[in-house]
Amino acid sequence: CRYEQSAGGSRQSAFPKDDVFRPLLADPKQPQFFASWQATRARTDRTYANVGSVGFGENFGFYTRRDGCNGWQVGLLAGVFSQFNLDAPSSELINTDYIVGIPLSWRSGAWSTRVRLYHQSSHLGDEFLLGRPGFNRVNLSFEEVEAILSYDYRWARLYAGGGYLVDREPATLDRIRAQWGFELRGPTMDSPILGTMLAGLRITPVLGTDFKSFEELNWVINTNVVGGIEWSMDGSTRRLRVLLNYYHGFNPYGQFFAQKIEAVGFGLYLAL
């Protein structure tokens, strides 16, 4: 039900293999497995860096009740997002964000929604701190309630929603966040390169844009654009994507949330 409709009947099950709410393609904080490289420019002090990012995570369904693709699901989400300074001799770890929470998703026809309560904590790398004596650390952690409403129409998808910090450190952080975006999926076709060797291998062009705006950052719009090719097999929910990426806005990771950056790069993404 992530990528195509099903005519199946009513059923309930534990540990479903997919979700009634499709994961957001262009959200930088979507729990997933990926590795990427970005040429990053700090817009405040005009410095440049080659940044490597890796992520591990997924939404794991505990229980679902469905009629075809319609229904609801509850599960567990967990994610790790780490950034590395590739210009340093040891490719030092800059920052890691840890996310864990409970998502509740629902679908009826073209409409779907995801509501989740999750915790995030951020931690700077040891080598990063050792090389910068006196660095002003911020112990950033929070719990947020988030809701996203999505609508699918043929090859397009629109979504919008937001979040509210129910608890946060520092306690002075403003609480409200808005989020919206769109996704486009082109026609799926046989893979022209590997399709002759691997029967059933398909490719789909994809494009997504995610926008976020935070009360804490005076509602400045942060933009993330991804586009590329997705590989899949008939009958499988697993996806392999090679995506180009452009980001403009405040840093989406860790205690650097007040740093204005611009980045361009590419990455490999696995949807399990």
Language-model region placement:
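Short loop/turn motifs that connect adjacent beta-strands in outer-membrane beta-barrel proteins
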Residues: 21-29, 62-74, 152-156, 186-205, ...
